[in-house]
Amino acid sequence: MGNESNNGKVPLISKIAYGFGDVGCNFSWMFVSNFLMIFYTDVFGISMAAVSALMLFSRFWDAINDPIVGGLTDKTHTRWGRYRPWLLVAAPITAILLVLSFWAHPDWSNTAKIIYMVITYCLLVLGYTCVNIPYGTLCGAMTQDIDERAKINTSRSVSAMIAIGIINIVTVPLISKLGSSSAKNGYLFVAIIYGCIFAACHFFCFAQTKEQVVIPEKEKISIKVQLKAVMQNKPYLLALVGQVLFGFTLYGRNADILYYFTYVEGNASYYTTYSMCIIIPSIIGAACFQPVFRKLNNKGRTASIFALLTGIAMLAMYFFNVKESPVAFYALAGITQFFFSGFNTAIYAIIPDCVEYGEWKTGLRNDGFQYAFVSLGNKIGMAIGTALLAALLGKYGYIANQAQNPEVIAIMKHAFSTIPGILWIVTAIVLFFYRLNKKRYNEIVEDLKKGKSHSNNA
């Protein structure tokens, strides 16, 4: 197994720096998930059908490159470690691709628009993969202490919630301010700013973190063997299913949210007010993961409870709107975000622990490969959610920058509340069966330190 070069404790500056990594990730990917679809349809002038097809096609692309990148990170050997160098190299390239993706050319032909969209989006996804997979895997390489990992992921989630809050609050006004009367220019200038933040945050994460868990060279293994090992890792498979559902609910709703406020509520500026109301609950909810985990001693069950409560609150939002009941609407939005933030912290805290379980179960350790499939699962969920939304809006007559028909309005409303609410409850049911608790995990780590494993006894 990997040997830890210290007592498992991680310096505070490293936890903060790791959190800044997810700040950077959100200034790229949350900007993309919340704004790229409406940018394509309402600014670039691309059809809903083309956007829907892109979302599905890009997941086939992910199915190829995610496992490859994950495997390559595990095989990387430098004086800076396995995973940190990827942040240094891939982050600036991805920042450039982010800017290119938000560079609209509305006067081009439809064919030229679609070709440009496909090329820039697929390259952006690849660039983000080259940053996000090693970044996510890095947590497990920083320590094997389950409580320290919980603290690291809490730092990650709190930082992410702050970043998401800032993005949601300032993006719409920034687009308007920087673009003056041109949304095209506004999106481009915002992408330049966010791209610089993305790169800077990952440089800081690279500089202030350290890989403490040293993986022996002999543990290089083929993709076929790694896939077989993954299929024997039951906690990981449950987490993977949870990530697919998570991607569907989060990104499908995020893609809908600006449409919802623009066309259902009638004013895109409500999105800024909504974002201001959820930022504090987001931060508090993320910080509440640790006390709930200490009570339950099971990260999967902790995620399950947060998911269930998120779903219930989101279902309740269907019955309220900004115009008629603003207090109830915004209060429920804050409650929903509080529970979601707790879930977001828990679901990512699960993954590193599954690596040790897999090593104990099969004798193989493959941190990057496992995180690659988590990333792929999340993106598959995202693809289904966004592609389905785009397909339904296109089928029922969505017309950009015009008043929408009742069917389109109904789709936007349900995509904002009832559909993700139901899926959160399904997610809660799946993760309830996660049984790798703190006691069992610590026993597994001790076995591994002594050279024992389930595979040795088989």
Model-identified regions with their sequence ranges:
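Membrane-embedded alpha-helical bundles of multi-pass transporters/translocases
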Residues: 2-458
